[in-house]
Amino acid sequence: MKTETPSVKIVAITADEAGQRIDNFLRTQLKGVPKSMIYRILRKGEVRVNKKRIKPEYKLEAGDEVRIPPVRVAEREEEAVSPHLQKVAALADVILYEDDHILVLNKPSGTAVHGGSGLSFGVIEGLRALRPEARFLELVHRLDRDTSGVLLVAKKRSALRSLHEQLREKGMQKDYLALVRGQWQSHVKSVQAPLLKNILQSGERIVRVSQEGKPSETRFKVEERYAFATLVRCSPVTGRTHQIRVHTQYAGHPIAFDDRYADREFDRQLTEAGTGLNRLFLHAAALKFTHPGTGEVMRIEAPMDEGLKRCLQKLRNAR
């Protein structure tokens, strides 16, 4: 429940909003306001909980009353997002499923899941612009920027907690489709190789197989074979950064047009074959999970975009 005066807004925290940090809560209330400004008003004591000053890490409880001061920014949120209006509108066309608890979309390749690291626009920012009335929208999991496919978003904090629990307990099944170099051997049904993440000076993340890394496993199944490539279904058992991309490379079958782990000769073959492919061929094809509100087991599939379909058709015709 909210009450407002011309200068101050008082928000009563519901059970669904409880448990989150005050700084994260303010980001949902003050859309378009820079994080630096949010921390400044917290530091200066302009934000109060139950009439007391609080620190950014304070966790809200049901029944808390949050005093939010008026915040002026140089640009209104609508103006700030205007260069991306076409991308925002496009997100409406790729929503696969939505109810009061969750939203599932077919993320386009080339779009980051969230802004940051020099990116001003991501899926979550776009969804918040598309659904300005939504009090809560948070990513349940992530996809690499160049990976397309099923992306799950929680619309309630209780839904986010339930779905994160499923991820931790391996109760969520993800299936990806990847086009890899050469003939994947049918007997290779699983790759188990520990992965170690390195951060370069540029800030770029590179992952490699290392005994010092975290245990990682991906299961594989051949879907279709072509003259010099294989379409494989990849089901990660663990959820490490770049896991499928590094495991396929480790198995000797890197994914097409992977800007970090690819085989350039394989990419050249695909170009010369007239596939028209110019992006990472990794697509999150399906996601199976238990609905956080109803308990129903759901399996949502995301179709490949036309570019990936054309590529596969070219390879079929060339056999």
Model-identified regions with their sequence ranges:
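RNA pseudouridine synthases
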Residues: 1-319
